[in-house]
Amino acid sequence: MDLMDGTQFEDFVADLCRRDGCTEVRRVGRTGDDGADVRGRLPDGRTMVIQCKRYNPKRKISNGEVRNLLGSQVHFKAEVAVFVTTTYFSGPAERCAVQNGVVAVHRDHLGLWNNGAALPSLTAVNGAGQGDRRHRSLRRNTYE
């Protein structure tokens, strides 16, 4: 994933959605995409909008980026907003996502999704899994 460019990463996320039974999945990401890189329907029929960010693991997703996705959710009248990234969320961004029902798929959860966990199952761990203090320290020493 770290070697993909932005378009390849969006295609990768769209393919994972299709694998999990999502329908009407299309990659729409481009400049001026109104914050939607992938759109479609979950297996239960709810509409979704996905923002994909392929960042260096040293960079964190900001609160503003999550708020932008919330605006996209309203703009596209999507029932579910999903933020998928190759990095992690800042504390305020993670809290904003959880408080507003955004499914926050960070680097660790993306690995689980890629290894076969279904997208709907990731909602159960939303806001978790960025690790305990020791894990965060190890990650910080590795990537920063």
Predicted feature descriptions by range:
Residues M1-D34, R39-E144:
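Mixed-charge (Asp/Glu-Lys/Arg
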